[in-house]
Curated annotation (Swiss-Prot):
EC numbers: 2.7.1.5
Protein name: Rhamnulokinase
Gene Ontology CC annotations of this record: cytosol
Cofactor: Mg(2+)
Molecular functions per Gene Ontology: ATP binding; glycerol kinase activity; rhamnulokinase activity
């Protein structure tokens, strides 16, 4: 029996999950979990990338302690951030987080030189200041000139493990530098940044064998002999692979620190309507495209908890929230002011004050406000998606950590007026494992993998119901007018 390890690292935590296929059912075991985050060093918010590597080795040692001598391994992480590699193969600096303030106004500045419509027509990617395009636009020229290669985070981890440099396509598409038509890094865009296209590794599809873990790591650490497979390395791409969807008329919501809501399509949509609504066409596994909107997620709730010194669990916060009427206060969760404020609670209160609403005071009121606002935003985006694609959405599959928030799932079902299916919460790791198993011939296809997922995990169901959607939508429009 083959053993598979998913290295799944998000913005706030990481985990190594052991998976195997037994009687057409996936069995998972969490082997190691660790915290992730950025710290302010050398003038920027930076990831502790060396510590992440150490956590991976600790996890792999735990795998071997189970008596597993050989395994297959895949890596997925968050998108857009990168590591600059020098001529000798060394890391030039710890990577800067997408939440760093260096890219403030970068979109505006670059698009004043290079029209938005032109960039969108080429790439089909949503305009966000965190995109790699804008990070490189403001990167220190000295570092860029010294860099031989630019590797996104999961590709860097794969490189450290195997010595092989690649640019996996699902994650590379998040950079806003891939040309949709040519299926390559766009030389014209890169030349505008004075970056040679050769600084990027060869584009590689999800499901491609990368290589064996280097001998030096086997000697330094007591870990299994691992074959590394390049999975869908962008965590959302893996989460979509891990979505237990069936049929055609469905949408997905990968709910975690961010909310990524969209549809899986066979061709991109980069027309005027998609451009106007700032939709993105991220590449998916096996020739698909993730037509989606990247919006705020549970980050706001996580920050409320942090400001409260974690006195309440997330379950307790949701329970407290249920004691208040929904939609008493509505915030625009996608407002940039909520990206990384000094104090999230104060920012929400100030927003409500500025928009003529009552100010939420308790932990329950604040949580109620955020969950209601998120559900409203989801429903509005599903409405826009239907208009742009011309496809009727009948089901929404919510995966990731947010699939455990029953209150948010039920509010979304009511506002959107469609059935909502929630789970699995570990869809990203599951999608990672499924791609490995397809590579190894244990699963035939992504469709077959999704059937196995449906048979392996409990999926929650939430029915649509009556709600004052149009009235709430009108109130939200008035709130936006204050801005």
């Amino acid at each position: 029996m083959k053993h598979y390890v998913a290295v799944d690292i998000g913005a706030s935590s990481g985990r190594l999950i052991l998976g195997k296929l037994v009687n057409e059912k996936l069995q998972l075991e969490e082997i190691h979990r660790f915290k992730n985050g950025f710290t302010y060093r050398d003038g920027h918010e930076r990831w502790e990338i060396d510590q992440l590597m150490q956590e991976i080795f600790i996890g792999l040692e735990k795998v071997k302690q189970l008596g597993i001598l050989e395994c297959v391994l895949g890596i997925d992480t968050w998108g857009v951030d990168y590591v600059l590699i020098g001529a000798s193969g060394e890391k030039l600096a710890d990577p800067i987080s997408y939440r760093d303030k260096r890219t403030l106004n970068a979109v505006q500045n670059l698009t004043s030189e290079y029209p938005r419509e032109y960039i969108y027509k080429k790439t089909g990617i949503q305009f966000m200041e965190l995109n790699t395009l804008y990070q490189l636009y403001v990167e220190e020229r000295d570092l860029l000139e010294r860099a031989e290669k630019i590797l996104l985070i999961p590709d860097y981890i794969g490189y450290v493990l195997t010595g092989v440099k690649v640019a996996e396509t699902t994650n590379s598409s998040t950079t806003q530098m891939l040309n949709l038509r040519e299926q390559l890094f766009d030389k014209d865009l890169l030349s505008h940044l004075n970056i040679d296209v050769e600084k990027f590794a060869p584009l590689t599809d999800a499901g491609t064998y990368l290589g064996k873990v280097k001998e030096e790591w086997l000697e330094e650490y007591d870990i299994p002999n691992c074959d590394v497979v390049t999975v869908a390395t962008h965590d959302t791409a893996s989460a979509v692979v891990g979505t237990p969807a069936e049929g055609e008329n469905w949408a997905f919501l990968s709910s975690g620190t961010w909310s990524l809501i969209g549809m899986e399509l066979s061709a991109p949509i980069n027309n005027e309507a998609a451009f106007k609504e700032n939709y993105t066409n991220e590449w998916g596994a096996y020739g698909t495209y993730r037509f989606l909107k990247n919006i705020m997620g549970l980050w706001i709730v996580q920050e409320i908890a942090r400001m409260d010194d974690y006195k309440h669990s997330f379950a307790e916060m949701a329970e407290e929230a249920s004691n208040y009427p929904y939609f008493k206060q509505i915030i625009n969760v996608n407002d940039a002011r909520f990206n990384n404020p000094e104090n999230m609670v104060d920012e929400i209160k100030l927003y409500c004050q500025e928009t003529g609403q009552t100010i939420p005071e308790t932990i329950g009121e604040l949580t109620n406000c955020v969950y209601g606002s998120l559900a409203l935003y989801y429903a509005l985006e599903l409405e826009k998606m239907t208009e742009i694609t011309g496809k009727k959405i009948e089901k929404l599959y919510i995966v990731g950590g947010g699939s455990n928030v029953a209150m948010l799932n039920q509010l979304t079902a009511k506002l959107a007026g469609i059935e909502v299916f929630a789970g699995p919460s570990e869809a990203t790791a599951i999608g990672n494992l499924v791609v490995q198993m397809i590579n190894q011939g244990e699963i035939e296809s992504m469709r077959a993998g999704r059937k196995i997922i449906r048979n392996s995990f409990e999926i929650g169901e939430f029915s649509c119901g009556d709600v004052r959607f149009e009235e709430i939508k009108e109130r939200f429009t008035k709130v936006l007018e204050f801005n």
